[in-house]
Amino acid sequence: FQSFAQKKSKGISFSLQVGSENETEKPKLVVGIVVDQMRYDYIYRFWDDFGNDGFKKLINEGHFFRNCQFGYVPTYTGPGHASIYTGTTPAVHGIIANDWYDKQSGDYIYCAGDGDMHTVCNCEQKNVDVQSADGKMSPHNMLTTTFADELKLFNSESKVIGISLKDRGAILPAGHAANAAYWMNSEGRWITSSFYMDNLPTYVQEINDNNTAQNYLIGTWEVDGEFSHNLESMFSQKGGAAIKNTPFGNSILTDLSLKILKNEKLGQRENTDVLTISFSSTDYIGHQFGPHAPEIKDTYLRLDKEISEILEELSKRVGQENVIVFLTADHGVVSEPNELLERKIPAGYFDG
């Protein structure tokens, strides 16, 4: 599988398959987890504070790849996710950045954009949202197949579903032949595109109605003596989308993944299924506060518990011996200039 990587080159990755005596036996479920903007050094920096059933379980009971490299630039979210799941580089799969200028057409291209599609949702402002860009998405800009596409070609009965707060984090990993991809719109609700379906499944509609982003944005996000952020104030300013800039964006995504496992019965049939999960809040928080901020550490300690919850649910519903899980990152992030300057490393800002 692909690797964790900074926006330099090196990184790590790990995967888990435990309990199967016959390694050629096909898994019932493959779960791909991408942690957006995760640097390889986070594993070492936060190791002592991680629990035993999240990151540590994957590392201690699985395979831990420490020395990997990206063979391309830029290492953004779009090309990162596409490269992980296609197994090739942007020059081949076509997702060369998050967005780019096409000289032949004279258009600016968004990596997951598709003007021929429309939003599918049960949104508060449905008529407006259907016409918005939130759901005008598909993987049509990706020129190659993902491993999930190859699985669907082999067995069309396999289910493939991708989820993320970001549209590109859900769409590109799931591939062209996916059954579904879900991401969060500007209201903080789960939506999809007409590329996949005409109506949201009932259980996704129920999540939007009963498990809204506002339910998570109560009180404060704080660590004593380190920071305190008023979640209700954030909601009043930005609405449900404010959850993306908090660790509770990872929580609501985890809750969606558990609902999908239950309602879609992934891994509980004869066919091999695929679930791709991309945690995006780590990227939003990383950009807002920087990789050395206390908010980052707290976010990853909370994410460790989310991963533990997912692994526990997989073990209960599918059986650990029937699941392959891999976890990696689409890219990392450079250190803040002020952090480097404190260590007497030349750094600074410039206007480009």
Please place each PLM-identified region on the residue numbering.
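A long, amphipathic alpha-helix that forms part
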Residues: 16, 42, 243-269, 282-323
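His/Asp/Glu-rich, glycine-adjacent segments
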Residues: 89, 94-271, 280-287
